Structure formats: structure tokens, C-alpha cells
């Protein structure tokens, strides 16, 4: 899969600046992914986000989108605004839907998914062989579906 042009990923407050594109490795079940800095329009880095392209069992639990905002920039909906831009990139890859997941105790991330009108599918137990369970001792994920 090729990396698409991402220069359109901006609005009147933020822009997503491509950090890396990972082509994926299907032999180990890794899908292609984009990693971005979330920046203001002067390109000051305020956080990071990523978009994973495609579908597999792991993405149901891990999600297609991940994000983090530096503490001094929190409270301005920058993660939600970045997600809306990533939705547009996902559409360019002909994705019809995607998942965003959050830990049940991560109230901020769950609020972002609700703010974005994601369909709450429920709280799911991670499979025993899931990397997040093995490496991070996580056991459950709130899973939200977004139809694009």
C-alpha cells in the first residue's frame, strides 16, 4: 500500500504533520499505518495521532485511531478535531468504518468517542493472546464504531 498525500489534513485550528508511514507487514498481522504530529497552524507540536488502514481481529480491540495530547494543550478538543481529519484520510483509503477503543477508566478518551458520535458497541474482554493484555496488563476495552 502506498502512502497518500496528507497535506489536506488541516482545519482552521490544527494540522496533521506526517511523522512516519509504516507500510505494514501482513506476515505478522500489522496493517499499514500513518503517524502524525497534531500541530497548531504554526506547526507547534501539541500531540500525536495515528491511523491504521485495513481490518483484522487485532484492530477490533486496538482500534484504527490512537491519539495523545500534551498536557498543556488538553481541553480544547484537539483529539476530536484530529480524528475528524483522520476520518477523511480513511475514506480516501476506501474504508467504510473504523473503530476507536479506550480503556474503561479513560474517561477523557471515552468522552471524545461520544463527542464524535461513535456507536458504543460495549466493553469487551481482551483475548488471552492479545498484545495489550500480555504487555500492558489491560483486560477490557470500550469499543466505538464510526461509519464513514
Which residues make up each language-model segment?
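Conserved beta-strand segments that form the floor/walls of ligand-binding pockets within enzyme
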Residues: 37, 50, 64, 68, ...
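Conserved GNAT acetyl-CoA-binding A-motif
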Residues: 91-101
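Short hydrophobic/aromatic beta-strand or adjacent loop that forms the aromatic wall/cage
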Residues: 33-35, 137-143
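Acetyl-CoA-dependent GNAT
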Residues: 4-60
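Residue-level signal for glycine
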Residues: 43-45, 82, 118
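Conserved active-site alpha-helix within GNAT-family acetyltransferase domains
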Residues: 105-122
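Conserved catalytic-core motifs of GNAT/GCN5-like acyltransferases
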Residues: 101, 119-136
Amino acid at each position: 500500500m502506498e502512502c497518500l498525500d496528507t497535506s489536506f489534513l488541516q482545519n482552521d485550528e490544527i494540522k496533521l504533520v506526517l511523522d512516519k508511514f509504516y507500510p505494514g507487514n501482513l506476515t505478522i498481522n500489522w496493517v499499514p499505518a500513518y503517524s502524525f504530529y497534531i500541530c497548531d497552524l504554526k506547526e507547534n507540536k501539541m500531540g500525536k495521532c495515528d491511523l491504521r488502514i485495513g481490518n483484522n481481529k487485532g484492530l477490533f480491540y486496538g482500534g484504527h485511531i490512537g491519539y495523545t495530547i500534551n498536557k498543556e494543550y488538553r481541553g480544547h478538543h484537539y483529539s476530536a478535531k484530529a480524528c475528524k481529519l483522520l476520518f477523511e484520510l480513511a475514506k480516501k483509503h476506501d474504508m467504510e468504518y473504523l473503530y476507536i477503543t479506550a480503556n474503561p477508566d479513560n474517561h477523557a478518551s471515552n468522552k471524545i468517542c461520544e463527542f464524535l458520535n461513535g456507536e458504543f458497541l460495549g466493553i469487551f474482554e481482551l483475548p488471552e493472546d492479545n498484545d495489550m493484555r500480555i504487555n500492558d496488563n489491560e483486560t477490557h476495552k470500550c469499543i466505538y464504531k464510526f461509519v464513514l
